[in-house]
Amino acid sequence: MPADHHAPDAALRLAQDLIRCPSVTPEDRGALDVVADALRPAGFAIERPVFAEPGYPDTPNLYARIGQNGPCLVFAGHTDVVPEGEGAWRHDPFAGAVADGMLYGRGAADMKGGVACMLAATLAFLDRRGADFGGSIAFLITGDEEGPAVNGTVKLLDWARRRGERFDHCVLGEPTNPGRLGEMIKIGRRGSLTGKLTVLGRQGHVAYPHKAENPIPGLLRLASALIAEPLDRGTAHFDASNLEFTTVDVGNPATNVIPSTARATFNVRFNDDWTAESLGAEIRRRLEQAAGNAVRFTLDLQPSNAPAFLTRPDAFVTLVAEAIRAETGLTPTLSTTGGTSDARFIKDACPVIEFGLVGETMHQVDECVAVADLERLTAIYGRVLDAYFPGS
């Protein structure tokens, strides 16, 4: 049964409709139709651009807007989900089952539940205020966030910019709360930089080491140089940058052969002390200093589309925090922890904060959210809309 978008349980019904679309990235399977069908009767103009990139599947996206004047508040999110996995679910991952006060399904937390709350809050706001509310509301919803994210928000924003669309602030509905709704607003994200380090040696028999050059001691030496000293001590809103080695490999199954190369991969999550360029220069400096003339190496730093960024705690952040406090009684922490999100693209268009449901079970078997949290998050988004567009 289609959701009654104006019922008290509209967020739950919309979330169920979305979950019942098995939109494992990059498939849509009707998920964006659910969004469009909710917004179109309220007067939103709907666009459905599909973006392409060689080597990647074409991906549908949705842009919706009501109003052309005044400040524009954007709700952003994604309707694609990760695969359901191989574990046994207590409930069908694409049924949207409710049991013991919990909504189960892939995407319940990340982030079909958040999208549903945005939709329900906006429709209720328009019911209260009508179309002449003193501004504009837009939706940026992609089907390419859980995948490579090349045909999603980054291209949708460029498409909107070329059409002359302008935005003032954005709420991205990612599941930001660790354990309780209202705990945390994300006001920024760390950057991400991946490096591939290769130390060059000369293959030979282990019984004749003088005729070979073992690259493994050199790799250990260079790896130690990267982690011996902290990259920084952290900043006002960010923890210290962190470098982690993720793979080490010599490609050598033989026990009597000295390998010709030794490779390691690492990833750095970095704060706003650095850009990808300045961090790359520091990494190379440390390696060259440690290598001297004794170790031959190559370094491949993968281009990063995830710089560190911060949305300064200003009046908009305060507005959202006050809406959360009014509904939950909690004062949210302003955080920059966690991985990357599409906020890294949105921050170039307008200030962006992230606030959504509890993410404790996202990407897990039996992903679920509390039905009561869907209602509370809808109310929080409603308070944000009322405060952002106070009217006369």
From Swiss-Prot:
InterPro entries documented for this protein: ArgE/DapE_CS, Bact_exopeptidase_dim_dom, DapE_proteobac, Peptidase_M20, Peptidase_M20_dimer, Peptidase_M20A
Catalysed reaction, written as an equation: N-succinyl-(2S,6S)-2,6-diaminopimelate + H2O = (2S,6S)-2,6-diaminopimelate + succinate
Residues engaged in binding Zn(2+) 2: D110, E146, H363
Binding residues for Zn(2+) 1: H78, D110, E174
EC number, as in UniProt: 3.5.1.18
Catalytic site: D80, E145 (proton acceptor)
Gene Ontology biological-process annotations: diaminopimelate biosynthetic process; L-arginine biosynthetic process; lysine biosynthetic process via diaminopimelate
Cofactor: Zn(2+); Co(2+)
A Pfam family: Peptidase_M20
Cofactor note: Binds 2 Zn(2+) or Co(2+) ions per subunit.
UniProt-listed HAMAP family: DapE (MF_01690)
Function: Catalyzes the hydrolysis of N-succinyl-L,L-diaminopimelic acid (SDAP), forming succinate and LL-2,6-diaminopimelate (DAP), an intermediate involved in the bacterial biosynthesis of lysine and meso-diaminopimelic acid, an essential component of bacterial cell walls.
Quaternary structure annotation from Swiss-Prot or TrEMBL: Homodimer.
Protein name in UniProt: Succinyl-diaminopimelate desuccinylase
